[in-house]
Protein backbone atom coordinates (compact mmCIF):
# COMPACT_ATOMS: atom_id res chain seq x y z
CA UNK A 1 0.00 0.00 0.00
CA UNK A 2 1.30 3.49 -0.77
CA UNK A 3 2.56 5.59 2.12
CA UNK A 4 0.28 8.00 3.99
CA UNK A 5 -3.03 6.78 2.59
CA UNK A 6 -5.84 4.36 3.35
CA UNK A 7 -6.33 3.67 -0.34
CA UNK A 8 -4.41 1.34 -2.59
CA UNK A 9 -6.73 1.33 -5.63
CA UNK A 10 -7.59 4.30 -7.83
CA UNK A 11 -10.29 3.91 -10.49
CA UNK A 12 -10.46 6.33 -13.40
CA UNK A 13 -13.20 6.94 -15.92
CA UNK A 14 -11.96 6.71 -19.53
CA UNK A 15 -13.97 8.98 -21.85
CA UNK A 16 -13.59 12.63 -20.95
CA UNK A 17 -11.40 11.96 -17.90
CA UNK A 18 -8.30 10.14 -19.12
CA UNK A 19 -8.98 10.22 -22.85
CA UNK A 20 -9.97 13.35 -24.72
CA UNK A 21 -12.60 11.43 -26.66
CA UNK A 22 -15.83 13.35 -26.09
CA UNK A 23 -15.60 15.26 -29.37
CA UNK A 24 -14.98 12.05 -31.32
CA UNK A 25 -18.04 10.42 -29.73
CA UNK A 26 -20.25 13.42 -30.49
CA UNK A 27 -19.04 13.71 -34.09
CA UNK A 28 -19.44 9.97 -34.70
CA UNK A 29 -23.06 10.03 -33.54
CA UNK A 30 -23.79 13.14 -35.61
CA UNK A 31 -22.31 11.48 -38.70
CA UNK A 32 -24.46 8.38 -38.21
CA UNK A 33 -27.57 10.56 -37.88
CA UNK A 34 -26.68 12.42 -41.07
CA UNK A 35 -26.04 9.20 -43.00
CA UNK A 36 -29.37 7.72 -41.86
CA UNK A 37 -31.18 11.04 -42.29
CA UNK A 38 -32.56 10.99 -38.76
CA UNK A 39 -32.93 13.85 -36.31
CA UNK A 40 -29.57 14.67 -34.74
CA UNK A 41 -29.55 15.17 -30.96
CA UNK A 42 -27.82 18.28 -29.64
CA UNK A 43 -24.16 18.07 -28.68
CA UNK A 44 -25.25 18.52 -25.06
CA UNK A 45 -27.70 15.61 -25.24
CA UNK A 46 -25.09 13.37 -26.88
CA UNK A 47 -22.49 14.39 -24.28
CA UNK A 48 -24.91 13.46 -21.50
CA UNK A 49 -24.72 9.77 -22.45
CA UNK A 50 -20.92 9.54 -22.47
CA UNK A 51 -19.93 6.98 -19.86
CA UNK A 52 -23.07 4.90 -20.26
CA UNK A 53 -23.10 1.61 -22.11
CA UNK A 54 -23.82 2.07 -25.79
CA UNK A 55 -27.29 0.47 -25.74
CA UNK A 56 -28.35 2.36 -22.63
CA UNK A 57 -27.10 5.66 -24.00
CA UNK A 58 -28.71 5.19 -27.39
CA UNK A 59 -32.05 4.32 -25.76
CA UNK A 60 -31.88 7.73 -24.08
CA UNK A 61 -31.12 9.76 -27.21
CA UNK A 62 -33.15 7.66 -29.65
CA UNK A 63 -36.15 6.59 -27.53
CA UNK A 64 -38.37 6.33 -30.61
CA UNK A 65 -36.32 3.53 -32.20
CA UNK A 66 -37.29 -0.11 -31.99
CA UNK A 67 -34.71 -2.73 -31.06
CA UNK A 68 -33.69 -3.56 -34.64
CA UNK A 69 -33.25 0.11 -35.56
CA UNK A 70 -31.21 0.75 -32.45
CA UNK A 71 -28.92 -2.22 -33.15
CA UNK A 72 -28.34 -0.93 -36.66
CA UNK A 73 -27.48 2.55 -35.36
CA UNK A 74 -25.15 1.07 -32.73
CA UNK A 75 -23.27 -0.88 -35.40
CA UNK A 76 -22.99 2.18 -37.63
CA UNK A 77 -21.72 4.17 -34.65
CA UNK A 78 -19.06 1.55 -33.87
CA UNK A 79 -17.86 1.70 -37.47
CA UNK A 80 -17.79 5.50 -37.47
CA UNK A 81 -16.03 5.66 -34.10
CA UNK A 82 -13.35 3.23 -35.27
CA UNK A 83 -12.60 5.50 -38.23
CA UNK A 84 -11.77 8.25 -35.73
CA UNK A 85 -10.17 6.30 -32.89
CA UNK A 86 -6.64 7.25 -33.97
CA UNK A 87 -7.54 10.88 -33.23
CA UNK A 88 -8.15 10.18 -29.53
CA UNK A 89 -5.38 11.23 -27.19
CA UNK A 90 -4.85 11.36 -23.47
CA UNK A 91 -5.34 14.68 -21.74
CA UNK A 92 -2.12 16.56 -21.00
CA UNK A 93 -0.39 15.24 -17.90
CA UNK A 94 -2.41 12.03 -17.64
CA UNK A 95 0.38 9.68 -18.69
CA UNK A 96 2.87 11.26 -16.28
CA UNK A 97 0.30 11.25 -13.48
CA UNK A 98 -0.63 7.61 -13.99
CA UNK A 99 3.00 6.52 -14.13
CA UNK A 100 3.65 8.48 -10.94
CA UNK A 101 0.76 6.83 -9.11
CA UNK A 102 1.85 3.39 -10.31
CA UNK A 103 5.42 4.02 -9.15
CA UNK A 104 4.05 4.89 -5.70
CA UNK A 105 2.45 1.46 -5.50
CA UNK A 106 -1.16 2.29 -6.28
CA UNK A 107 -3.25 -0.22 -8.16
CA UNK A 108 -4.93 1.51 -11.10
CA UNK A 109 -8.11 0.60 -12.95
CA UNK A 110 -10.45 2.03 -15.56
CA UNK A 111 -14.24 2.14 -15.26
CA UNK A 112 -16.04 2.63 -18.55
CA UNK A 113 -19.21 1.88 -20.44
CA UNK A 114 -17.05 0.57 -23.28
CA UNK A 115 -16.82 -3.12 -23.99
CA UNK A 116 -13.59 -4.81 -22.92
CA UNK A 117 -12.58 -5.01 -26.58
CA UNK A 118 -13.35 -1.32 -27.06
CA UNK A 119 -11.28 -0.32 -24.03
CA UNK A 120 -8.36 -2.52 -25.08
CA UNK A 121 -8.45 -0.96 -28.53
CA UNK A 122 -8.51 2.56 -27.05
CA UNK A 123 -5.67 1.76 -24.65
CA UNK A 124 -3.53 0.35 -27.44
CA UNK A 125 -4.18 3.37 -29.69
CA UNK A 126 -3.33 5.85 -26.93
CA UNK A 127 0.09 4.38 -26.08
Residue ranges of each PLM-predicted region?
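A metal-dependent, Asp-based hydrolase signature
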Residues: 50-80, 92, 100-102
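Active-site neighborhood of HAD-like aspartate-dependent phosphohydrolases
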Residues: 2-48, 64-67, 103
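A short acidic, helix-capping loop that chelates divalent metal ions and anchors anionic groups
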Residues: 41, 56-59, 80-84, 118-120
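Short alpha-helical
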Residues: 24, 53-56, 96, 117-118
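Short, structured helix-loop boundary elements
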Residues: 22, 43, 47, 67-74, ...
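Short, acidic loop-to-helix structural element flanking the phosphoryl-transfer center
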Residues: 6, 83-110, 116-124
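Conserved hydrophobic residues forming the short capping helix/wall of the S-adenosyl-L-methionine
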Residues: 33, 62, 123, 127
Amino acid sequence: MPKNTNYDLIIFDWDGTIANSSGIIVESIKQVCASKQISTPTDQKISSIIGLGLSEGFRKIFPYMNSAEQKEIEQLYREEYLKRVDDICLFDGVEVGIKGLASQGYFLAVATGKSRRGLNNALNKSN
